C-alpha cells in the first residue's frame, strides 16, 4: 500500500522537483503523514507557477525538509497541509527578456480535465514555510529578501478560515468558479548593496527595509471546463511602515531602479504583445453537457442567491493592488559620508514624509468598452477621468476616419484595400468590445484582436510633508510644508488628497495600427503648500546631488537613457481648494496690522495640454488671442517705449496656429508634409508641440497672521477668474525641423500627383470647416493669418524674438485689491526674501553641478482690463469742521454715533412719513422735467447745536417734527450710517428728492427682503463721462439695531473737486441685479455731460449723504458689533484712496539673469473716499463687479508707461542699476485731483522703516494737470478756506542717480526710446488763488508763475537768427526777445480771462439753481 502511494506521490511531485527518489520520502499511510528531505525544485516549473515577469529568472531553489499531512476522511472540508522548513531561492535579472512563461503545473496536473474533486483538493492545499531566503543578483547590485513564517491557505469570501466548501463560489451557468486565498508572513527583511569591483568603484550604502506582519489576498476566477485562470485579483496589504533613509541610501535605490528600468520596460512590451485576448473576453455560457450536473439539486432560490453572491465577488478583469495603511518616511543627510564635493548650505537636515491610506492599482488588460465601475475605490475622480478619456477617444476616432480617407486618396491606383472604420475599430464612445471581424484591414486581413489599455491608479487619502529640521534648531514639533486640509474644509473623508491615473493603449498581438496617445489624469484636493526657505534650499541641494550621482551611475554602467520624455502624453490636472502660503522670512517688530504671510488660493483649477476641458478649448484661446490683439502694446511691431526692438514676440504665431488647429498631425498630412499611413505612430506627436492651458475659476490672495484680524485672513486681492496659456516655440520648431529632415514624405510620388493629392486634402478640409461653421452658427472674430500655412512650408528657424517659453496670462474680470502701510512694508520684505532664496538656489546649482545654470528665456504677457487699487491710509484729522472731506461719514457705512452732549454732525433723520408727505411736493416737478429737481442751498456746516441744525434745514421740512425725530433717534441709540455720495459741482441736484420718489416707485418700503434702494448717480454737463448707476451698501449693521422704517440722513459740507466725480459705491452684485430689474425708468436722471477738462477752478458745493436702511437686509457681523463704541471706531478708521486703473498691459522678458518688465496703463482715476471703517469697507465693497463704468472708454494713448530693468544688462544705464535695477517711467496727459492730506498720507504709506535701496530712475511727466485742495486743519474757524491750486505740467524730467540725488529738468531725456509729444514749447506751473464760492470773482486776481523749459530757452534764438529769411527781414535779436515777452504777457492775460469766465459761468449756474428752489 505504501509503495503504491509513493508511486502516486512521485508521479505528481516529479512535475515540481528534480532528482526525486522514493528513498527521500518517509510515509505513514494510516496517519496520512509524510516527509521529504533535500528537495530541489524545478526552476522553470516554479517560474510558470508563480508567473514571474520575464526580466527575472530563477536559477536554483532548494528545500531542506518538507512535511505533508492528508486528512483522508475530511478531504472535502479540510485542506491538505504542506510544511516547509527552509527554502533558499537564487534569482537573477535578465538584460534581455527571457521566453514567456508556460502554463501553470496546477492546470496541467489534471491533464486539462474539468474542475472536479481532485482539482478542488489540490487547490485547497495549505502551505507554511518557516523561512524563505531569496537572493537576487543584478547588473549593478545584489539584493536579498528574508521572509519568516509564511503561510498560504484558502479562505471564504470574507477572508476568514472555514470549511473548504465555502472557499469557492461556483456558477454553472457561466461555467466559472471563484476561489479565495490569503498569504501572510510575520516579517520581511530587504537588503540591497552595490557590487564592488575593480572596474566600478562606487561609494554606496546598503539599503535595508524591515516590515512587520503583512498579507496578500488573491481571488482567482477559473473556467470549469479546463481549469484555466480567466482573471485574478491580487491585493498586497502592508501595515504601518517606518523607513529611515539617508541620502546615500536613497541615491543607491534610485541607481538600482535605473539599472532595472531598461529590462523592465522591454519585459512589459513583450508581455503586452503576447497578452492573450481570450483571457479578457467575456466567457459565453456553457451548455449543460459541458458541465457535470451536481449530485444534489438546488432550488431556484438557492441558485439566485449563488448568482448574486458570484456577481458581488466577481473578478471582471485581472488587477494588482498595493494598500499601505500608513507610511512614515524619514530622509536625512548622511553626515559620515566623505564623497561630498560641495559645502551644504543646510547641514544635518532631515525631512519626514507621512502618508495615510496609500493605494496603487494596476489593470494590465482593461477593455474600454467594459467601463470602470467595477474598479476598486471607484469614485468621482475616476468618473471625471473616464468622461475626459471618452472625449479624447472620440477625437481620435474622427482623426482615424480622416486618416483612412487620406490613405485611400494617397493610393488611388492600388487595389481595393479598405481600412476598418474607427467606430468599428474603437467604438463610438471608446474601444468597442464588439468589433466586426468581417471588416478587412488595409491589407485585406481581418483584425486579429481588440485594443486594450493598461492603467495605473494611485490614491492617497491624506499626507503630510514636514519642513526640514536640523540639529541646531530648538526641539519642537515640525511644521508642515505640504499637507491636506480636508478636515478644515469639511470635505468628504472618502475624497482622496491626490488621485493619479495613467493609461496606455496597445494591441495584444502587436498589430501595427494607430493607437491613441497615453493619458495622465491628476486630481489634487485641498492641498496646502507652505514656502519654507530652509526646506527649499535643503531639497534643492538634495535633489541636485541625487541627480548628479544618477548621471554618473548611468555613465559608469553605460546604461541607455531610453526615457520617453519627448513622447506626447495627454495630461489633465484638476485642483480643488488649493492654497499656497508664503510666510515672511524676516521677523520684525510685529504691528497689529503686520501680516505674517500671504496665501494664494484657488477654488478650482484645471490644467491640460488637451482641448477637451472647459475653458481650455481652442475657441477660448482664440478669444484670448483676440483680446490681446486689440492692444498695440502686444504687437511685435510695437517698439516704442516701454517696449524695445529686442523684445520677445508676446503673441507668438504658435498660439494662433493652435487656435485654428493648424499644428496637428492631420494638418501636416493635409499640407503634404507627412505621408498618410496606418501604422502605430501615424497620429503620434512630440511633447514639444504641447500647448498648455491653465484656468483658475476663482483666484484670490489673502494676508495671513494679522493680529487685528483676530485669526481670520484679511483680503489682499479679491477673487477673479484667471487663464494662462503656455507654449515652447524653440522645442516646437526643433521638433518640426526633425520631422521635415526625415526626408520628403511624398518623394515616391510625381510632382503632379503630389500636388493633386495635397489639393484634394485641402479642399476636403475646407469644405468640412465650412459646413461645420455654418452649422455652428458662430463667426470667429480672429481671422486666420494667410502667412500661417505658408510659413509651414518653409523650414522652421529660431528667431531672436522667440523665447524658450511663451506665456499669455489673461484676467477676464475686474480685479480689486487693498493694502495699507504695514502690508506694503511686508510685501517689500517678502520680495527681498524671495529674491534671496532665488539667489541661493542659483548659487547651489552652480556649486553642485560645477557649471552655471542654463540660461532660460521666458516671455510673459499679462492683460488686465480694469482694477481697483485701494490704499488704506492714515485717517484724516477730525478737528477741522470745514474740511473738504467728511470727518465722520464715508461712502461706506460708519456706525459711530455722537452722544447728545457732543451734538449732531449735520445729520437730519427723516422717517417714512416725511418721505410720503414730500412725495406730493416734488411729484409735479418730476413729471414736468426730471432734470429740474434741484435742492436748496442751506450751506450746512458742522455744528454742535441741534437748534442751529434745525434752523438750517430745508424750508419744506417741519423743524419741530424733525427735531422730535432726531431726539427719538438719539434716545434709542441708533447708529447712523453716513454714505457720502459725490455730487456734481456745477449742478447741485436734489438727491433727497430722488430718494423720496425712487424708493416709492420701486415699492421698496412694502416689498420684503433684499430690496436695497438704488441711487442713480446724477450726471452733469461738466463731468467727463456718464457713469453707470451704483447702489449704496447698507450691510454690516447689526440686525437688531436696524429701525423698521426707512431713514434718510442729510449732510452738507464743502467738497473738493476730486469728490465731485461720481463714485462707484459698491454693494452686493445680487442686489444690483435685483434693483436694475425693478427699475421703473429712473434712468432719465442721467444726462449727457460735457468735457470736464476746462473746469480747473473749484466752486463751493454742498453734498448730501443718504443712508437707506432696510431691516430685512441688515446683517449682523462681528465687525459691526466691534465698532459700537466710538473709541473702537476711531481706531478702526482709515482714509481710503481708490485708484481705478483701466487697460493694464504688461510684458515680462526674462533672459537668464536679466529681466525686463514693461507696463502700460491706459487710464488712472483716483477716488478719495475719506475716512472709512476698515473692516466695514472690506466687508461691504463689491468684489464681483466688472466696473464697466470705468472701462467703457479707452484713451488713444496711455497715461502711464513704465519699464523696469533688472540684472547685469541694466549696467548700460548706470553701475548701480546692475544690482538694484533701473526704472523708466513716462506719465502723459494725466489729470487728477488730490487733497494735500492724501498726498501726505501717500508719502507716509511708501515710507520704509529702514533705509531703502537706491534705485536709479528716469521719470518724465508731460501734459499733466493736478488739482490740489488744502484740507489741513485751520487754527481758527474764522480763517478763510484755503485756496485751491492747479498744477499744469507740460514737460518735467526727474532723474535719480547712483548717489541718490534727484535731478529735475524741464527738457526730455533723449535716452528714453519713446516719441515724446510736446504740444507747447513751455512748461507752466500755474497756481490759482481765487475763491470758487466768491460772488465777485471778477475782481479777484489770480497769481501765477511761469517756468520756461530748456528747449525754449534763449540760447536757441541764435539758431533762428541765422536763418536767411529772418536776416532778410531785418529782425534783430532784441526785437525777438521783446516780442517774446509781450507774447508771454498776452498769453497770461488770456488764460486769466478764460479762468474768470469759467468761474462766472459756475456762479451763474449756482444762482440759477437757487432761483428754481425759491420758486
Swiss-Prot record:
Keyword Cytoplasm assigned: yes
One example of a Gene Ontology biological process annotation: early endosome to Golgi transport
Chorein N-terminal domain: residues covered: 3-94
Gene Ontology terms: cellular component: cytosol; early endosome
Annotated Polar residues bias: 275-300
Keyword Coiled coil attributed: yes
Database matches in PANTHER family: BRIDGE-LIKE LIPID TRANSFER PROTEIN FAMILY MEMBER 3B, CHOREIN N-TERMINAL DOMAIN-CONTAINING PROTEIN
Name the record gives this protein: Bridge-like lipid transfer protein family member 3B
The organism of origin for this protein: Xenopus laevis
Lineage: Eukaryota, Metazoa, Chordata, Craniata, Vertebrata
Amino acid at each position: 500500500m505504501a509503495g503504491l502511494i509513493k508511486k502516486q506521490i512521485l508521479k505528481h511531485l516529479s512535475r515540481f522537483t528534480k532528482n526525486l527518489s522514493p528513498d527521500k520520502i518517509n510515509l505513514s499511510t494510516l496517519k496520512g503523514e509524510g516527509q521529504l528531505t533535500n528537495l530541489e525544485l524545478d526552476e522553470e516549473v516554479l517560474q510558470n507557477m508563480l508567473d514571474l515577469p520575464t526580466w527575472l529568472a530563477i536559477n536554483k531553489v532548494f528545500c531542506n525538509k518538507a512535511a505533508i499531512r492528508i486528512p483522508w476522511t475530511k478531504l472535502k472540508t479540510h485542506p491538505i497541509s504542506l510544511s516547509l522548513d527552509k527554502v533558499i531561492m537564487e534569482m537573477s535579472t535578465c538584460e534581455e527578456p527571457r521566453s514567456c512563461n508556460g502554463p501553470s503545473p496546477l492546470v496541467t496536473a489534471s491533464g486539462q480535465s474539468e474542475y472536479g474533486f481532485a482539482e478542488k483538493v489540490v487547490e485547497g492545499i495549505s502551505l507554511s514555510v518557516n523561512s524563505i531566503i531569496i537572493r537576487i543578483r543584478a547588473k549593478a547590485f545584489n539584493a536579498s529578501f528574508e521572509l519568516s513564517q509564511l503561510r498560504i491557505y484558502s479562505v471564504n469570501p470574507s477572508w476568514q478560515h472555514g470549511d473548504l466548501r465555502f472557499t469557492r463560489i461556483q456558477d454553472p451557468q457561466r461555467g466559472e468558479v471563484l476561489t479565495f486565498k490569503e498569504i501572510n508572513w510575520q516579517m520581511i527583511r530587504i537588503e540591497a548593496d552595490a557590487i564592488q569591483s575593480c572596474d566600478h568603484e562606487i561609494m554606496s550604502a546598503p539599503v535595508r527595509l524591515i516590515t512587520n506582519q503583512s498579507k496578500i489576498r488573491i481571488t482567482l476566477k477559473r473556467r470549469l471546463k479546463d481549469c484555466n485562470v480567466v482573471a485574478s485579483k491580487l491585493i498586497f496589504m502592508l501595515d504601518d511602515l517606518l523607513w529611515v533613509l539617508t541620502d546615500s541610501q536613497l541615491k543607491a535605490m534610485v541607481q538600482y531602479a535605473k539599472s532595472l528600468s531598461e529590462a523592465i520596460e522591454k519585459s512589459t512590451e513583450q508581455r503586452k504583445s503576447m497578452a492573450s485576448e481570450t483571457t479578457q473576453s467575456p466567457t459565453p455560457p456553457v451548455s449543460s453537457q459541458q458541465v457535470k450536473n451536481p449530485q444534489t439539486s438546488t432550488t431556484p432560490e438557492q441558485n439566485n442567491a449563488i448568482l448574486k453572491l458570484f456577481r458581488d465577488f466577481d473578478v471582471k478583469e485581472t488587477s494588482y493592488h498595493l494598500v499601505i495603511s500608513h507610511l512614515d518616511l524619514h530622509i536625512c543627510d548622511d553626515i559620515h559620508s566623505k564623497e561630498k564635493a560641495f559645502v551644504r548650505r543646510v547641514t544635518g537636515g532631515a525631512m519626514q514624509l507621512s502618508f495615510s491610506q496609500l493605494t496603487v492599482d494596476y489593470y494590465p488588460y482593461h477593455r474600454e468598452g467594459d467601463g470602470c465601475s467595477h474598479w476598486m475605490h471607484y469614485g468621482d475622480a475616476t468618473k471625471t477621468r473616464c468622461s475626459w478619456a471618452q472625449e479624447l477617444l472620440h477625437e481620435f476616432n474622427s482623426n482615424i476616419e480622416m486618416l483612412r480617407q487620406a490613405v485611400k486618396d494617397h493610393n488611388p491606383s492600388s487595389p481595393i484595400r479598405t481600412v476598418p472604420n474607427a467606430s468599428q475599430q474603437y467604438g463610438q464612445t471608446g474601444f468597442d468590445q464588439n468589433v466586426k471581424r468581417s471588416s478587412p484591414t488595409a491589407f485585406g486581413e481581418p483584425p486579429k484582436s481588440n485594443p486594450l489599455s493598461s492603467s495605473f491608479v494611485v490614491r492617497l487619502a491624506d499626507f503630510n510633508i514636514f519642513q526640514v529640521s536640523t540639529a541646531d534648531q530648538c526641539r519642537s514639533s515640525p511644521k508642515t510644508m505640504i499637507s491636506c486640509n480636508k478636515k478644515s474644509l469639511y470635505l468628504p473623508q472618502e475624497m482622496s488628497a491626490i488621485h493619479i491615473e495613467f493609461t496606455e493603449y496597445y494591441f495584444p498581438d502587436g498589430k501595427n495600427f494607430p493607437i491613441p496617445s497615453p493619458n495622465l489624469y491628476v486630481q489634487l484636493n485641498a492641498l496646502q503648500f507652505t514656502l519654507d526657505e530652509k526646506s527649499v534650499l535643503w531639497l534643492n541641494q538634495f535633489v541636485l546631488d541625487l541627480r548628479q550621482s544618477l548621471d554618473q551611475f548611468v555613465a559608469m554602467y553605460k546604461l541607455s537613457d531610453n526615457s520617453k520624455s519627448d513622447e506626447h502624453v495627454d495630461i489633465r490636472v484638476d485642483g480643488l481648494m488649493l492654497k499656497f502660503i508664503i510666510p515672511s522670512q524676516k521677523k520684525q517688530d510685529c504691528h497689529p496690522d503686520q501680516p505674517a504671510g500671504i496665501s494664494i488660493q484657488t477654488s478650482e483649477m484645471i490644467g491640460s495640454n488637451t482641448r477637451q476641458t472647459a475653458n481650455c478649448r481652442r475657441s477660448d484661446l482664440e478669444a484670448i488671442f483676440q483680446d490681446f490683439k486689440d492692444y498695440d502694446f502686444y504687437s511685435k511691431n510695437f517698439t516704442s517705449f516701454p517696449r524695445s526692438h529686442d523684445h520677445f514676440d508676446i503673441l507668438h504665431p504658435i498660439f494662433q496656429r493652435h487656435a485654428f488647429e493648424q499644428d496637428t498631425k492631420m494638418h501636416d498630412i493635409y499640407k503634404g508634409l507627412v505621408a498618410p499611413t496606418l501604422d502605430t505612430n501615424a497620429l503620434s506627436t512630440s511633447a514639444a508641440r504641447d500647448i498648455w492651458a491653465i484656468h483658475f475659476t476663482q483666484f484670490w490672495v489673502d494676508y495671513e497672521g494679522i493680529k487685528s484680524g483676530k485669526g481670520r485672513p484679511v483680503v489682499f486681492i479679491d477673487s477673479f477668474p484667471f487663464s494662462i496659456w503656455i507654449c515652447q516655440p524653440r522645442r516646437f520648431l526643433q521638433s518640426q525641423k526633425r520631422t521635415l529632415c526625415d526626408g520628403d514624405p511624398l518623394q515616391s510620388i510625381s510632382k503632379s500627383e503630389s500636388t493633386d493629392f495635397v489639393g484634394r486634402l485641402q479642399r476636403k478640409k475646407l469644405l468640412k470647416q465650412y459646413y461645420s461653421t455654418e452649422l455652428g452658427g458662430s463667426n470667429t472674430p480672429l481671422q486666420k493669418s494667410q502667412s500661417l500655412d505658408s510659413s509651414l512650408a518653409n523650414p522652421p528657424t529660431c528667431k531672436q524674438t522667440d523665447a524658450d517659453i511663451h506665456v499669455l496670462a489673461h484676467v477676464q474680470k475686474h480685479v480689486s485689491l487693498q493694502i495699507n502701510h504695514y502690508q506694503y512694508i511686508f510685501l517689500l520684505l517678502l520680495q527681498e526674501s524671495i529674491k534671496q532664496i532665488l539667489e541661493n538656489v542659483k548659487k547651489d546649482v552652480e556649486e553642485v553641478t560645477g557649471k552655471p545654470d542654463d540660461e532660460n528665456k521666458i516671455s510673459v504677457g499679462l492683460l488686465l482690463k480694469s482694477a481697483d487699487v485701494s490704499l488704506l491710509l492714515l485717517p484724516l484729522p477730525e478737528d477741522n469742521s470745514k474740511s473738504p472731506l467728511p470727518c465722520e461719514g464715508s461712502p461706506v457705512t460708519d456706525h459711530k454715533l455722537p452722544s447728545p452732549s457732543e451734538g449732531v454732525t449735520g445729520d437730519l433723520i427723516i422717517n417714512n412719513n416725511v418721505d410720503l408727505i414730500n412725495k406730493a411736493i416734488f411729484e409735479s416737478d418730476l413729471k414736468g422735467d426730471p432734470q429740474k429737481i434741484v435742492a436748496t442751498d442751506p450751506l450746512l456746516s458742522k455744528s454742535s447745536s441741534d437748534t442751529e441744525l434745525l434752523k438750517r434745514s430745508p424750508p419744506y421740512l417741519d423743524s419741530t417734527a424733525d427735531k422730535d425725530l432726531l431726539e427719538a433717534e438719539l434716545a434709542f441709540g441708533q447708529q447712523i450710517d453716513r454714505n457720502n455720495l459725490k455730487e456734481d459741482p456745477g449742478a447741485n441736484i436734489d438727491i433727497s428728492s430722488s430718494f423720496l420718489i425712487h424708493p416709492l416707485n420701486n415699492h421698496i418700503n412694502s416689498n420684503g427682503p433684499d430690496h436695497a434702494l438704488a441711487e442713480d448717480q446724477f450726471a452733469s454737463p461738466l463731468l467727463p463721462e456718464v457713469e453707470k448707476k451704483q447702489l449704496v451698501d447698507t450691510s454690516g449693521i447689526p440686525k437688531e439695531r436696524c429701525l423698521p422704517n426707512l431713514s434718510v440722513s442729510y449732510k452738507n459740507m464743502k467738497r473738493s473737486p476730486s469728490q465731485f466725480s461720481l463714485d462707484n459705491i459698491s454693494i452686493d452684485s445680487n442686489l444690483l441685479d435685483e434693483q436694475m430689474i425693478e427699475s421703473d425708468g429712473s434712468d432719465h436722471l442721467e444726462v449727457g455731460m460735457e468735457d470736464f477738462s476746462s473746469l480747473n477752478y473749484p466752486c463751493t458745493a454742498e453734498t448730501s449723504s443718504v443712508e437707506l436702511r432696510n431691516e430685512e437686509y441688515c446683517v449682523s457681523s462681528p465687525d459691526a458689533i466691534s465698532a459700537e463704541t466710538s473709541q473702537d471706531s476711531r481706531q478702526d478708521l482709515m482714509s481710503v484712496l481708490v485708484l481705478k486703473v483701466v487697460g493694464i498691459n504688461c510684458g515680462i522678458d526674462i533672459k537668464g539673469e536679466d529681466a525686463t518688465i514693461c507696463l502700460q496703463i491706459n487710464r488712472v482715476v483716483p477716488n478719495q473716499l475719506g475716512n472709512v471703517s476698515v473692516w466695514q469697507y472690506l466687508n461691504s465693497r463689491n468684489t464681483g463687479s466688472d466696473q464697466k463704468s470705468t472701462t467703457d472708454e479707452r484713451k488713444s494713448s496711455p497715461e502711464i508707461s513704465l519699464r523696469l530693468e533688472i540684472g547685469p544688462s541694466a549696467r548700460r544705464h548706470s553701475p548701480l542699476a546692475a544690482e538694484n535695477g533701473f526704472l523708466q517711467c513716462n506719465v502723459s496727459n494725466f489729470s487728477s485731483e488730490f487733497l494735500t492730506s492724501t498726498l501726505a498720507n501717500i508719502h507716509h504709506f511708501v515710507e520704509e522703516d529702514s533705509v531703502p535701496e537706491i534705485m536709479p530712475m528716469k521719470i518724465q511727466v508731460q501734459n499733466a494737470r493736478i488739482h490740489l485742495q488744502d484740507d489741513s486743519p485751520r487754527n481758527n474757524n474764522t480763517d478763510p478756506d484755503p485756496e485751491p491750486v492747479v498744477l499744469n505740467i507740460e514737460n518735467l524730467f526727474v532723474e535719480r542717480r547712483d548717489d541718490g540725488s534727484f535731478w529735475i529738468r524741464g527738457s526730455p531725456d533723449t535716452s528714453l526710446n519713446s516719441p515724446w509729444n510736446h504740444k507747447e514749447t513751455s512748461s507752466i506751473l500755474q497756481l490759482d488763488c481765487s475763491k470758487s464760492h466768491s460772488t465777485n470773482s471778477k475782481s479777484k486776481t489770480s497769481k501765477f508763475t511761469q517756468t520756461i523749459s530748456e528747449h525754449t530757452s534763449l540760447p536757441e534764438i541764435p539758431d533762428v537768427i541765422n536763418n536767411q529769411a529772418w536776416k532778410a527781414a531785418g529782425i534783430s535779436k532784441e526785437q525777438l526777445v521783446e516780442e517774446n515777452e509781450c507774447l508771454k504777457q498776452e498769453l497770461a492775460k488770456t488764460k486769466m480771462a478764460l479762468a474768470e469766465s469759467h468761474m462766472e459761468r459756475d456762479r451763474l449756474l449756482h444762482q440759477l439753481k437757487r432761483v428754481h428752489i425759491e420758486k
